[in-house]
From Swiss-Prot:
<feature type="binding site">
    <location>
        <position position="219"/>
    </location>
    <ligand>
        <name>a divalent metal cation 2</name>
    </ligand>
</feature>
<dbReference type="InterPro" id="IPR036069">
    <property type="entry name" value="DUF34/NIF3_sf"/>
</dbReference>
<feature type="binding site">
    <location>
        <position position="223"/>
    </location>
    <ligand>
        <name>a divalent metal cation 1</name>
    </ligand>
</feature>
<keyword id="KW-0479">Metal-binding</keyword>
<feature type="binding site">
    <location>
        <position position="223"/>
    </location>
    <ligand>
        <name>a divalent metal cation 2</name>
    </ligand>
</feature>
<feature type="binding site">
    <location>
        <position position="64"/>
    </location>
    <ligand>
        <name>a divalent metal cation 1</name>
    </ligand>
</feature>
<protein>
    <recommendedName>
        <fullName>GTP cyclohydrolase 1 type 2 homolog</fullName>
    </recommendedName>
</protein>
<dbReference type="Pfam" id="PF01784">
    <property type="entry name" value="DUF34_NIF3"/>
</dbReference>
<feature type="binding site">
    <location>
        <position position="65"/>
    </location>
    <ligand>
        <name>a divalent metal cation 2</name>
    </ligand>
</feature>
<dbReference type="GO" id="GO:0046872">
    <property type="term" value="F:metal ion binding"/>
</dbReference>
<comment type="similarity">
    <text>Belongs to the GTP cyclohydrolase I type 2/NIF3 family.</text>
</comment>
<dbReference type="InterPro" id="IPR002678">
    <property type="entry name" value="DUF34/NIF3"/>
</dbReference>
<feature type="binding site">
    <location>
        <position position="102"/>
    </location>
    <ligand>
        <name>a divalent metal cation 1</name>
    </ligand>
</feature>
<dbReference type="GO" id="GO:0005737">
    <property type="term" value="C:cytoplasm"/>
</dbReference>
<comment type="subunit">
    <text>Homohexamer.</text>
</comment>
Length: 251
């Protein structure tokens, strides 16, 4: 199997062309005719991740956050140059899937959580189309116990919260990463909790005034889910060594 074959499989799986994304999905650096020898999957194509891909002897690196984004300057200098240089020196092909790996209904950063935690009455959630998030219901649980459950799932501590909702919860909406602005949409949906990665000042008063619990577990922690699920999927689909790289980014 070469990189072009892998890309064909990923495109069929993730349907990237239906998304208006913030950067290019698919092959960002490399040659599509390169044979796939070993695959590494990670959250972000930063220098540490690329170094670990080199150490793992992977020649394909699939990430959620690639190198190129809309509005970037054209010159390849500084940290971007260092990343690309290391990829090329070690013949690592870089593939990125951003919003498609948020929104996927079984492998994505959002739906995978809801499925793993046995939420029911699941439906798409968010203010953009295609919808990126998910909302659903579950057996009533104290908010502190719900936070502990999510912390164990994400293997990360709660980074920020504004507990404006009920102390006993049975519904939630979830969009991973930097989606704290979707808190208002969650309040409109009348769920008890909104779960995301990042937070900022407006989330505090919005949660308290909208009678909803806001929970942030970190951008990276909430966006490991999809890449990990994708790595497991590729292991089951192809007889090619596949590994997940975790740089332990606490943000």
């Amino acid at each position: 199997m070469n990189v072009a074959d892998l890309l064909s499989h990923l495109e069929t799986l993730l349907s990237s062309k239906i998304f208006q994304d913030y950067g290019p999905n698919g092959l960002q650096v490399g040659d599509p005719q390169t044979p796939v020898k070993k695959i590494a999957v990670a959250v972000t194509a930063d220098l540490e991740t690329i170094k670990q891909a080199v150490a793992a002897e992977a020649n394909v690196l699939i990430v959620h956050h690639g190198i190129f984004w809309k509005g970037m300057p054209y010159p390849i200098t500084g940290m971007i140059h260092k990343r690309i240089q290391l990829l090329i020196e070690h013949n690592i092909q870089l593939i990125a899937y951003h919003l498609p790996l948020d929104a996927h209904p079984t492998l994505g950063n959002n739906w995978r959580v809801a499925l793993d935690l046995n939420w029911h009455d699941l439906k798409p959630f968010g203010s953009s189309l295609p919808y990126l998030g998910v909302q659903g219901s579950f057996s009533p649980i104290d908010i502190d116990s719900f936070i502990d459950l999510l912390s164990q799932y994400y293997q990360a501590p709660l980074k920020g919260s504004a507990l404006g909702g009920p102390s006993r919860v049975s519904s939630a909406a979830l969009i991973s990463g930097g989606a704290y602005r979707e808190l208002s949409s969650a309040a409109t949906s009348q769920v008890d909790c909104f779960i995301t990665g990042n937070f900022d000042e407006p989330a505090w008063s919005t949660a308290l005034e909208s009678n909803i619990n806001f929970l942030a577990f970190g951008h990276t922690a909430t966006e490991k889910v999809g890449p990990k699920s994708l790595a497991e999927h590729l292991k089951s689909e192809f007889p090619i060594s596949t590994t997940f790289i975790d740089t332990a980014n606490p943000f």
